[in-house]
């Protein structure tokens, strides 16, 4: 297989048909057609979504290794107000890698077990992995390999991170309900802004274990949009929570909800708080991590291996491990001189570096299939 020719042919086609979450219709059709022509057993519309799976079966007993790619893009607003779909997070690169791995594995053949390509929608809104889990796409999988192109300051071309330690993140929003009154008679009302300000101060006074990287930020505070001489009766408030520990994240959520509800009561207001979205932190398997590091070093040399890296971003791939604890997962970071940053409409990268990812993931898959139970 000419890997560079594969990249040059496939990436532009996927880049040109960028589609947002759960609308990856053309993208999914392209992937399904490509994989079916390789002889994979393709299942489309998994869980009633654009998700698809493709299986290559050796016909011999052994583990099932999943190679996961995301499919969706981001939407950017143009000057005329229109929304433009752009692959600014590298999912076009991820799909190009997955198809390259699928093709190499088909050419090499499998000694035992099965390979399952997971083409996942809606990563950008954190719902695609859960949709595939709910549809049973991971029920027959023992190993799952994820990966992401990384900014240049984390990994350069010729380097691969063996494990990205993604952070757990939770978005929460609440509503504070007071009682409206005229500004000349504040004692007859309940000022939701007063309660909200106290909530923000209480949130800022929380101190989490610095070794776990926990943080809570107030990211929304909206209220009092009416007259300036009216006591505000409603405030909308929002929070961004982060932690490297899934256990600590549960505690942070509890604390935020307690503060919002109980602080509002002190001011005579009512409040509620709920989760809008969440992603768990990465949980690496030690034995798989060691094997991944070994494979990267063998392919790229010692200078090409970055053993692990922490990042404060969330990734819904981590739901696979959280919902299937017996699953062994790895999340690799692909160095490709990516600039200026992810989620920038002008993001660009070294396409030739995708060949490293294709080779490493193919070799890692083959090594896993050779692991003796």
Where would I find each of the regions flagged by the language model?
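Metal-dependent amide/peptide-bond hydrolase catalytic core
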Residues: 197-373
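Structural motif
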Residues: 63-66, 115-116, 142-145, 197, ...
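General structural feature for long, well-ordered alpha-helical segments within catalytic domains
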Residues: 3-10, 23-34, 63, 97, ...
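Active-site beta-loop-alpha junctions enriched in small/polar residues
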Residues: 19, 70-72, 122, 150, ...
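Non-cysteine beta-strand/loop elements that form the S-adenosyl-L-methionine
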Residues: 66-68, 77, 172, 329-336
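Histidine/acidic-residue-rich, glycine-tolerant segments that coordinate divalent metal ions
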Residues: 52-55, 74-88, 92-93, 105-221, ...
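Acidic/His- and Gly-rich active-site-bordering loop/insert found
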Residues: 1-88, 92-111
């Amino acid at each position: 297989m000419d890997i560079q020719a594969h990249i040059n042919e496939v990436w532009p086609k996927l880049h040109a048909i960028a589609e947002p979450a759960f609308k990856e219709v053309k993208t999914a059709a392209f992937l399904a057609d490509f994989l079916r022509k390789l002889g994979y057993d393709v299942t489309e519309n998994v869980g009633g979504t654009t998700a698809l799976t493709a299986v290559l079966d050796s016909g011999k007993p052994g583990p099932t290794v999943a190679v996961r790619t995301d499919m969706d893009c981001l939407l950017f607003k143009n000057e005329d107000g229109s929304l433009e779909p752009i692959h600014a997070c590298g999912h076009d690169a991820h799909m190009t890698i997955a198809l390259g791995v699928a093709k190499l594995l088909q050419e090499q053949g499998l000694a035992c077990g099965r390979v399952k390509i997971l083409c996942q929608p809606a990563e950008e809104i954190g719902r695609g992995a859960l949709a595939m889990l709910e549809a049973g796409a991971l029920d027959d999988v023992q190993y799952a390999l994820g990966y992401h192109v990384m900014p240049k300051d984390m990994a350069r071309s010729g380097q691969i991170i063996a494990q990205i330690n993604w952070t757990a993140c939770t978005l929460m929003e609440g509503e504070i309900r007071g009682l409206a009154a005229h500004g000349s008679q504040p004692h007859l009302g309940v000022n939701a802004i007063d309660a909200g300000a106290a909530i923000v101060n209480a949130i800022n006074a929380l101190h989490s274990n610095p070794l776990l990287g926990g943080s809570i930020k107030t990211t929304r505070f909206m209220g009092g949009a009416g007259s300036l001489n009216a006591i505000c009766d409603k405030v909308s408030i929002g929070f961004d929570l982060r932690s490297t520990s899934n256990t600590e994240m549960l505690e942070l959520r509890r604390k935020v909800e307690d503060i919002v509800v109980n602080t509002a009561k002190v001011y005579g207001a009512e409040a509620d708080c709920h989760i809008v979205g969440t992603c768990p932190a990465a949980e690496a398997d030690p034995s798989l991590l060691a094997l991944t590091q070994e494979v990267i070093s063998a392919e790229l040399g010692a200078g090409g291996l970055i053993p692990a890296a922490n990042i404060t971003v969330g990734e819904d791939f981590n739901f696979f491990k959280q919902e299937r604890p017996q699953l062994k997962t790895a999340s690799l970071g692909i160095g490709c001189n990516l600039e200026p940053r992810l989620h920038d409409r002008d993001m660009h990268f070294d396409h030739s570096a995708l060949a490293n990812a294709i080779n490493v993931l193919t070799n890692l898959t083959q090594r896993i299939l050779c692991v003796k139970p």
